[in-house]
Each structure stands twice: as C-alpha cells, then as structure tokens.
C-alpha cells in the first residue's frame, strides 16, 4: 500500500536516530519517536482524523504525546499494566481515558475503536483471557488478536511487534489474523533499532492491518515463509518486498 510505504519511508532514511533512541523491545515505554511519527504519518495518509484510538500497553504515553495535530479531535484511550507508568500517563494526559490494568482485564466492546496503535509487549509467554486461551497466543500475538476484535470493520491496527508474528514456522496466528484483516503493509525494522536501551538485537516489525467486514478464507502470501538466498526462512511478504 503506497500510503503506508510513504508514511514509513523515513524509517529507512533516518536509521542513525535509532542509535540514540531510548527504546525497549519488551514494552511500549520508550518507543523511538521516529517510529511513532512514521506510524502516525501512515495513518494520516489513510485519512484518520477522528474517532476512538486505543493504545494498549501505553507505558507513560509516548504515542499519546506525539499524536499529530490533524488527529486532535480523536478520543484517546490507553491501557497500562504497570501502576507507576500508568499513573504517570494519567497525570500527563488527563483528557485521555487511561486504564491501569492488564489488557486481558479490559472490557471494551467489540468494534468500538477506529484504530489501535502501539508497541505491544514481546515475549515467549501467554496471558490468561478466556476468549483467547484456546489459541495459546504468545503475548504479542494476543495483543494483535484482541485489538482486531476491538476495532470496527474498516478500522486499522498499527503495531510494533516481534518478528515472530510474521516469521514463526506455525502459521496459525497469521491465519487467525488473515481471516479477520487485510495486511496493508509491513516494515521490518533494523535489528539494532532498539539495541542501546534493551541491550538486544531482537528483530521487530511495524504491521498495519485493516479489519474486514466479514471473515475471509483467503490465504495471502504472508501466511507462509520463504527461504532467502542466504538460507534464512522469513515471511514471504518480506522475501517479496525486500525494500
């Protein structure tokens, strides 16, 4: 999708900013402002100007603080498990509706939001949510799955997530997502994008999904993996779109 690519173009051009970013691949507390602004720019290109926006795992509210003027009429919601970070976010952004609890404990109605945006928690662990327990989703995949239920048909889920969502051998979570949403675009971040703060080179992706009006049985290319010339297995989307 051209609007997504246009909005995220500077992610590639300004990689030097990542080395200075105090970011973490384990939570959304310190997402790089470069990444945040690029994601919002893509959403602006899609025409998002009003409605309800949710940031799950909002930390102290970095996405809230960088929301562009063009989206000033939106209603911003946030969820944060950590009580200290949650209280800071509530103090900084008093007009926003911020819940200090686990995402799995929230009870927002389905199709309530126009957009979900954020840096979801990464990790090889699960949370308990009766609606999703049978799928055994890892934490990052769970956040995406629940977010898709919370946005309206036509709504967008824009997240920074572990590359495991797109690259894991088992395609079950991708099939779950594909049944419910179209992949508008994806950007693989440099594997050192968050290294200075997190002391790790975990690979992460920015993914944009648009919720379908009805369930689909399509099997898009990004359900599957492909082997690169170097012998690595990566998602077919990235193999076909190396740019």
Region locations from a protein language model:
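Single conserved hydrophobic/aromatic residue that forms the stacking wall/gate
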Residues: 2-12
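Short glycine/proline-rich turn/loop motifs
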Residues: 16-24
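Class I SAM-dependent methyltransferase Rossmann-like catalytic core
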Residues: 24-31
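Conserved S-adenosyl-L-methionine
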Residues: 31-125, 137, 162-164, 207
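Conserved Class I SAM-dependent methyltransferase catalytic core
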Residues: 39, 79-83, 136-195, 202-208
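Conserved ATPase-coupling elements of RecA-like P-loop NTPase cores
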Residues: 125-129, 169
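Short glycine-enriched, charge-decorated loop/helix-capping segments at active-site entrances
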Residues: 130-135
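Flexible, glycine-/basic-rich loop-and-beta segments that form/coincide
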Residues: 196-243
């Amino acid at each position: 999708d051209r609007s997504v690519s246009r909005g995220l173009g500077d992610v590639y051009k300004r990689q030097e900013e990542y080395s200075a970013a105090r970011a973490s691949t384990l939570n959304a507390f310190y997402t790089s402002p470069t990444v945040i602004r690029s994601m919002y720019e893509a959403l602006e290109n899609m025409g998002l100007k009003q409605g309800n926006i949710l940031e799950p795992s909002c930390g102290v509210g970095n996405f809230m603080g960088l929301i562009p003027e063009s989206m000033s009429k939106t209603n911003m919601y946030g969820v944060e498990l950590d009580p200290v970070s949650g209280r800071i976010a509530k103090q900084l952004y008093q007009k926003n509706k911020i819940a200090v609890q686990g995402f799995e404990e929230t009870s927002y109605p389905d199709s309530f939001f126009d957009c979900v945006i954020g840096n979801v928690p990464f990790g090889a662990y699960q949370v308990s949510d009766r609606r999703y327990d049978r799928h055994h989703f890892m934490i990052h995949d769970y956040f995406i799955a629940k977010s898709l239920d919370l946005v309206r048909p036509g709504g967008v889920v824009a997240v920074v997530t572990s590359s495991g969502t797109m690259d894991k051998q088992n395609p079950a979570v991708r099939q779950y997502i594909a049944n419910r949403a179209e992949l508008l675009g994806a950007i693989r971040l440099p594997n050192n994008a968050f290294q200075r703060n997190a002391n790790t080179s975990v690979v992460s992706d920015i993914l944009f999904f648009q919720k379908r009006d009805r369930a689909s049985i399509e099997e898009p290319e990004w359900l599957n993996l492909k082997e690169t010339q170097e012998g690595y297995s990566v998602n077919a989307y990235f193999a076909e779109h190396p740019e």
